[in-house]
Amino acid sequence: MKKLSLIWISLLAVFTFVGCSDDNEVEYNQSSDVTVAVPEVTASTGTSLTVASSVTGNTGSIVRRGFCYSANSQAPTVNDNMVEADENFSATISGLMGNTTYYIRAFVYGNSRYTYSDALEATTESQPIDEQLANYVAPAYEDNYTSIADWTNRSRWNLSNVHDPSVVLAEDGYYYMYQTDASYGNAHMAGGHFHGRRSKNLVDWEYLGGTMKNLPDWVVPKLNEIRKEMGLEPTTADEADFGYWAPCVRKVRNGLYRMYYSIVCPGTLSGDGTWSERAFIGLMENSNPANNDGWEDKGYVITNASDRGLDFYVNASADDYWNENCYYKWNAIDPSYIIDNDGRHYMAYGSWHSGIALVELDEATGKVKAELPDPWGTDADIAAYGQLIATRQMGNRWQGSEGPELIYHDGYYYLFLAYDALEVPYNTRVVRSTNIAGPYVGMDGTDVTTVGGEAFPILTHPYKFNGNDGWVGISHCCVFDDGEGNWYFASQGRFPVDVPGINASNFIMMGQVRCIRWTEDGWPVVMPERYGAVPQVEITESELIGNWENIDLSYAYGEQKTSATMTLAADHTVTAGDWEGATWTYDSSKRILTLDNGVELYLQRETDWEASPRTHTIVYAGYGDDYKTYWGKKSK
């Protein structure tokens, strides 16, 4: 469990914020001596709403008045978005998205407290898509969120402090996101586990809080039950040292949502000279994720399994320490839950160790369908703990692959994999199969199920465009769709190590959502720039002429891939860059740019996050006939 132990220690080593409390003085309506009227809309456009309110009571104490608004939070505060009101208690809220509903509250401040009105729901007018693009306002939140990283600022986090996200689209139209317990400065430790947030537009996210208050009651008894059967003493681990990792949330049907989660037990099996303690995967259910306190724990699902009997002692002088000493065959973290085309329920899981395993689940209970024997013995003894569906090297017990994400699309099951260490080198691969149990095969024909090998293509990799520090650690993804044919890739991105002026910069972890497009051959490509709700106006051929920042996303362990200039000329030739001398054609109906050297690029309008101020741009992602991945962005 290299991933788990090293990162948990590292996170605890980062400086800890002090003074985190709930005394966030933005929500005071109790016993107020003023009454604020619900706002009214006096004018609206596709990008703005003009609103007015009034206040009665002890108005002499009021020193400030205004309006706060949000597309997500139904009770926005001044920690969301806010505009000051004029002397008539009126204001224009600008920079809004067209045909979008906002929640708006009027507020006043006096006597050291805020008083709010009830919320108004107001919708901006629809705009022609060309006008939407012309009026586009990019997301304003800062990637360097250190100034708001502490617990008292959690209502302002948006996508700050996110790691290993899992996203589900619920019946109420919200996307709900849940995550590993990790944050800059360990701010999350003030508020439970498996923290949630939600969004209507995948850009603005409302923080909801922890879904689990304490270590589940079943964990320590189950751990001690297994330890007793192994001939070991009960655990003496401190509850504060357990890890809470990598939830997977899915909608099973209307009124039923399941969250599979990982609990990592601290310590070793029997002191120095023995292997690490095990992990568990458990299950929670909820009928409505809008009720963040409604997650009911359903208990134990599965644990680590070893094919080495009770031989958990390590040889410190082993030539290949991790591979030779690794006690477990399967590591019970990083669950991914799927219902296949025949209505059968499965869970893929695994991190490092021998690779990724698949088990069938009982539809009614969500637990493993087969009866689970003791989690140690021979390979045959532990067969119920899963079958291998992906490995980087057959027989290697310590390989950098984890975070499986299993989805179905257009005739194939796609298995997304996180490769290498998560701090910097993390990168994402994908393989596919027509059968949920495999064999899973990469774009280059490598069978990672029955033979083993490196999975291709690469979907994400450490990178940077010009004028920016870029991102590393971009993996452990969730893949989801909006029900209307649009697919998304959510993961964390981390700042590189030692960014000047930022303490512990690599512990800045930002939730990131990117668009997925599917190639003509059915492979996913992930856009390089993060999703920012840019209107998808047709991309014309004339817009492609000029310079691009092109990134060759070929694998290089721990290296941030940088961009080089690539120029498309009006005569359909490439006049600069690695593809100089090639010719190109463009299919505007499919938004596909094809070069005669075998490269096929899929275009999309996205936010230019590196620009100042941020704006919209055109990006691409695609593959060459050598299975290389390319990312690019149009230069301004």
Residue ranges of predicted features:
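C-terminal motif of bacterial Sec signal peptides marking the signal peptidase cleavage site
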Residues: T16-G19
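Carbohydrate-active catalytic/glycan-binding domains of CAZyme proteins
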Residues: D23-E25, S126-K636
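Positively charged n-region of N-terminal signal peptides that target proteins for export
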Residues: M1-S5
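Short, surface-exposed linear motifs at loops/turns and structural transition points
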Residues: D22-Q127
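Sec-dependent N-terminal signal peptides
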Residues: L6-L11
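N-terminal leader/targeting segments
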Residues: L12-V14, Y426
